[in-house]
Each structure stands twice: as structure tokens, then as C-alpha cells.
Amino acid sequence: MVSEGRVVRVNGPLVIADGMREAQMFEVVYVSDLKLVGEITRIEGDRAFIQVYESTDGVKPGDKVYRSGAPLSVELGPGLIGKIYDGLQRPLDSIAKVSNSPFVARGVSIPALDRQTKWHFVPKVKSGDKVGPGDIIGVVQETDLIEHRILIPPNVHGTLKELAREGDYTVEDVVAVVDMNGDEIPVKMYQKWPVRIPRPYKEKLEPVEPLLTGIRVLDTVFPIAKGGTAAIPGPFGSGKTVTLQSLAKWSAAKVVIYVGCGERGNEMTDELRSFPKLKDPWTGKPLLLRTILVANTSNMPVAARESSIYVGVTMAEYFRDQGYDVLLVADSTSRWAEALRDLGGRMEEMPAEEGFPSYLPSRLAEYYERAGRVIALGNPERYGSVTIASAVSPPGGDFTEPVTSNTLRFVRVFWPLDVSLAQARHYPAINWIQGFSAYVDLVAQWWHKNVDPNWKEMRDTMMKVLIREDELRQIVRLVGPESLAEKDKLVLEAAKLIKDAFLKQNAYDDIDAFSSPQKQVRIMRLIYIFYNQSQDLISKGVPLKKILDKVGPIEPEIIRIKYTIKNDELNKIDEIENKLKATFDSLLKEVS
């Protein structure tokens, strides 16, 4: 029998209970007769410090605390895709049906996976086979996009004694029995896993394949690889949420998990409304058929922000183990860090910089280190990845504050949003001077092999132009562009073309919202031709004004490509390219 404790003190979401000598760290407990879910975060003697994931209004000293004997865990199995959960993996749609209220009642307990729904199970092995951790024993077609693979749990191995025939089963039905050293272990279609423990894998690999997003600045300027980590810091109103929503909508991931952590509820509502209507550009099916939403909005309990991040990343690892590429989008980790600060203050811990706890960097590291591309456990051999992209909301856009500066230590892609770009209506407002990607050289090989062998050369030329333009900006402010050398005037003209034709992208335009890799390269090639050919002519003594008089009428056509030419109509770009080359050829003939 698991022992009970008693509440001795209540301080907001922190409850202190005694009589908890046998309790363990991170064990789930239920506080008072309301059965409020909490997690033990510190033990001193027989006292346990519990962070409660629901409102503690009405909880008083003397109330009972019931131990569960298990850590905070999630249910992993068929039925996850297309659902919206709260930070404790409680299905919000099921709660709405039961409670008949727009609010989540306290102490409500509904399993994450529907116990009534039947799934069509197709076995992939046979009785008598040797099985080990991660082996696929059968599959369930969960949605049109996702084939859910039923795995042997990581701690089970032995001989398959029984296996269910092909047919319809609920997640509670036993589909296999494994003889493990004489013990019969039942295997159901779902398994439970503690959220704070990373799921095991066979081998971690270097991320070499880009996670294509259809957003030009993210794919070409600062690319992210499958299994990579990225941060999007930016002040209020700079476009973090729209950029993250574009990532969730258009990225080439098989499964997308969107965690709304401490942000406005309207944003999650927007996702729920738009995802069923929008079509996945890679498959043509509704986006909700590959998406899981975890909503822990700003008006929900602060403590559950931490659990929502861990719930999301554990579900991501589960689909990675099935051999899928998963994208985890978290908006925003700053709200989670603020929850840590709040709880740290209530537990009277020594504060570090700006009041955040001293263990903030290690918590961020634990989270980002769960990303990666791996060879999954079990047979058949399969590759999966978890890519993490998180928003950071620094107060006043100060990138030196602790959450942003510590996040920078652990991510390999930095997409900083610049409020001055947002105010100038340049979206996505990613600052091309401050941003960086450590994956450029790794993903270049994929681009060269699958799209264009000159991809890196064109990208690097574009970046050099943008960096040089930034250096010239101060001079132009002081003395005007007329005093510049011809080649520097060309830099300003080329940079303007890069911004207007390539970097700016309208997330709400039907054609421009998603740009295929081929289309991105074709636009970049036109800019590359314009810059290189103009440079050659200037070196031969042709003034820039003369070049622009001839080429000027073609520039608006290059800028309009993103709005007017669809991803499957790239042959129309050939006409513009031929016209551009012919114009430069005629200029060259005039010089020679």
C-alpha cells in the first residue's frame, strides 16, 4: 500500500507535505480530495515539496496527499495524431464533452488515449520470433499520412509467445505476450514513458539532411537540418508566432508537435481552425492528419508549462523511434523559464541572474539535447529525427537576458527577429547579420546533389552582398550613395533585390507561403547572374546607371516571381532568365 502524507503549507502552486519519507523525486502525487495532480521536486527528511499543476485554491493544511508511486508519464500509442492536449496530456476535446464547460475542471482525470476506439492491427512478425526493445510487431493506419508502428517497449526482450491476428483492437487489448526469462510480459498497443527520461536509441548520427520549410530565409540563408535545434528570439510583435506556425504548416517533417507554452489561447485556436483546412504541400492531405497540439496557454496553471515542454518532446521521441522525422515547435521557452523562476522563488532557492534559478542552463540543455537524428532501437533498422524549434521572448528584445543567452549555448541555428525589420513590414523579420546556422556546410551536400551544384556558391555570394551592404549603410547615411564607388553602388542595388525578391515572404499569400527548393534556387540564380554580370561590366568601365537602364525593367519581374509563378510552373522563370542573360550579352557587345 502506497503511504499518504498531509499538507502542512500552501504557497500558490507549491505545496509542502509531511509524512512523505518513502516518496521519490519527481513522483506524481494527488493533493487533497480534489486529487490535484502534482510532482515532487524536492525532499527534505519526511517533507516533500510538490509543484501542483492545477490551481491550489481551497487546499489547506491537514489535507491528504496521495502518492502514485510513479513518475509523471505520458501514454504513447495510436490516437495521438490530430489531438489537442493540455500540459499533462489530458485530451481537451474529451474534457469538453464530459464537463460541458469552457474551462477545465480541477482534478479531472481522463486517459490521453481513447479506450473505446478500435484500431485495425496488422501483425508484422510471428509467434516464436525473438524480439527485443524497439522491434516493430505490427502496424496501425492511424491517419491517411501516418502508419503507426507498434513497438516492443524499451525494457522488454525475449521470445514472442503469443501474437494477435489481424483485426480491430482497442489500445487496452493485449496484442502480444513476450516470454522474458520465464515471465510472461503482456504488450498492448500503447506504452507509458516518464517524460523526464529521454527514450533510448541505438546510435546518434550527424544531421546532414535539411529540414525543408518552404520559407526561403530559413531554407537557404540559415538552414536547419533534420535533428537540429533552432531558436527564434524576438520582441513583442516581431512575428515569432507566425514564423513558427509557418514552420509547423509547411515543413517536410512527417509529424509536427506544436507546444503552446504560456502564450495566448487565441494562437492555439488559430491553429485548430486553420490546420484542418490547409493542405500539406508534400502530400496534399489536411495538415491536422500529421499534427499534435499541446496547449498550455497563459491562463492555465503556471507550473504545467514545464510539463507541457517535456510531454511534447517525449511524444516526439516516440514517433522518432518509429522511424519518422518529427518537428517539435515550442512557443515559448521564456514562459517556461518564468515558471521555473516563480517556483524557485516559492521554494526559497538562491536566485541567479535576473532572478532565474541557477539550474536554468542545465534544464535548457536537457531539453535541446533530446533533439537529434538517430538509428532507432529494434528491427527493421530505421532512421528517425527530432528537430526542435523554440521561440524565446526576451523582454524589450534584449538578447543578453539569461534565457536567450543560455539558449544560444545549446542551439545550432539562430533566427533573431528584428523589430525594426518588422516595423518596415519586412517579414519574416529575421536579421541576416545577427543570425547564424552551423548546418550550412553539412546540408550543402544535399542541395548540391538534389537541387543545384552551385547552391553554396550562390548562397555565400548573397551573404557577402548583405554583409557589405550593412557596412556601407553608415557611410550612405552620412554622405549619401552618390559618393560611393560604382562597385559599392552595385552592392546596394543587389542587396535591395535580394531583400525584395528573396528574403521577404508573405505567409498569407497562397503562392508565396511555400517556396519549393527548386524555386528558391531559381530566384537565387537570377540574383547571382545580375550581381556577377554587373560586376564584370563595372570592371570594364560601364557605369551602374547604364546597366540599370537596360536591366531595370527586368528587376520587377524577378521580384514578382514569388507571387506569380507557382512551384510547378518553374519553366516560366526560364523566360526571365533568358531575357536577363540576353540583356547582359548586348551590354557586353557594346563594351567590346
Swiss-Prot record:
- Which Gene Ontology MF annotations are present? ATP binding; ATP hydrolysis activity; proton-transporting ATP synthase activity, rotational mechanism; proton-transporting ATPase activity, rotational mechanism
Tell whether Translocase is among the UniProt keywords: yes
SMART domains associated with the record: AAA
Entry GO terms, CC? plasma membrane; proton-transporting two-sector ATPase complex, catalytic domain
Record EC number: 7.1.2.2
What UniProt keywords apply to this chain's record, in alphabetical order?
A: ATP synthesis, ATP-binding, Cell membrane, Hydrogen ion transport, Ion transport, Membrane, Nucleotide-binding, Translocase, Transport
Q: What is this protein called?
A: A-type ATP synthase subunit A
Q: Family assignment?
A: Belongs to the ATPase alpha/beta chains family.
One annotated GO biological process: proton motive force-driven plasma membrane ATP synthesis
